[in-house]
Amino acid sequence: MGEIRSFVLITVALILGKESWVLGDENCLQEQVRLRAQVRQLETRVKQQQVVIAQLLHEKEVQFLDRGQEDSFIDLGGKRHYADCSEIYNDGFKHSGFYKIKPLQSLAEFSVYCDMSDGGGWTVIQRRSDGSENFNRGWNDYENGFGNFVQSNGEYWLGNKNINLLTMQGDYTLKIDLTDFEKNSRFAQYEKFKVGDEKSFYELNIGEYSGTAGDSLSGTFHPEVQWWASHQTMKFSTRDRDNDNYNGNCAEEEQSGWWFNRCHSANLNGVYYQGPYRAETDNGVVWYTWRGWWYSLKSVVMKIRPSDFIPNIV
């Protein structure tokens, strides 16, 4: 009888112990679920904070560049020379701004705005934004470059010499970002963009087109006008250096320097008008295949990067 009682007590103890183990396991699982939920909440908060910090850093960078001071250049410490903005991007510098670059055949560094958005690594060769710069200039100015190399939205022309030095390094893609006064945006992109040297009068060469703005540079939008509207293989002209195919002087009539033919279907260095315009002359900031000859665009950015560049799509 005593043995039976002992067996029963042992059995009851085992059953109670097993139940406590089960309860312990359930409590442990509940605690794990609770902790995991807390971790997810913390991760979400961290991501939200990271977004806020990134936005604040971007706003600070823009304010810094917009102050109009010469110290708005981003100093990389002079550790190495960069051939273009794509090399700067690949070296870990991801903020848009003014940097110093030195193409392979260049004798000296020069300043340029690097657009690290839109996949990164873009070297900006021209910008129109507000009409603050006069683009009706002579050969020397267009050859050497001019404009605002301080403010992030400043207007400038990088200079035909510098554009030649950049594009002779290899195959480059040209992307042109266009915006009208109704806040619509389009782009035109050309492969194998190249500008010749001074002996060729900085001749323009472009390859295959893609984009949403239409192909105004090659003149292929209508075969009947291509002979006079195409900018392909055109020499650069200014008011004091007439290299176009026109009997008159396109640069003088259009009040800008450009790769004129007889005269143009695109002129992104044209007269800046404070709003769209209709006039008998087509001397505005023109991209014919989007807004026609008599609409002057609000903003333009011409930027290039190596064709084999692998963009950041994050």
From Swiss-Prot:
Q: Which UniProt keywords apply?
A: Adaptive immunity, Coiled coil, Disulfide bond, Immunity, Secreted, Signal
A Pfam family that this protein carries is Fibrinogen_C
Coiled-coil residue windows: 28-62
Disulfide bonding pattern of the chain? 85-114, 250-263
Q: Which GO terms describe its cellular component?
A: collagen-containing extracellular matrix; extracellular region; extracellular space
Q: Where in the cell is it found?
A: Secreted
Q: Where is the signal peptide?
A: 1-22
Please state the protein's primary subcellular location. Answer: secreted
Q: Which GO BP annotation is one of this protein's?
A: negative regulation of T cell activation
Citing just one GO molecular function, the answer is: identical protein binding
SMART domains xrefs:
FBG (SM00186)
Source taxon at top rank: Eukaryota
Outline the extent of the Fibrinogen C-terminal domain: 76-308
The cross-references to SUPFAM superfamilies, in alphabetical order and at most eight, read: Fibrinogen C-terminal domain-like (SSF56496)
Share what the entry says about its subunit structure, partners included: Homodimer. Interacts (via the Fibrinogen C-terminal domain) with LAG3 (via Ig-like domains 1 and 2).
Function summary: Immune suppressive molecule that inhibits antigen-specific T-cell activation by acting as a major ligand of LAG3. Responsible for LAG3 T-cell inhibitory function. Binds LAG3 independently from MHC class II (MHC-II). Secreted by, and promotes growth of, hepatocytes.
- Name the chain's protein: Fibrinogen-like protein 1
Q: Which organism is it from?
A: Rattus norvegicus
**Which gene specifies this protein's sequence?**
Fgl1
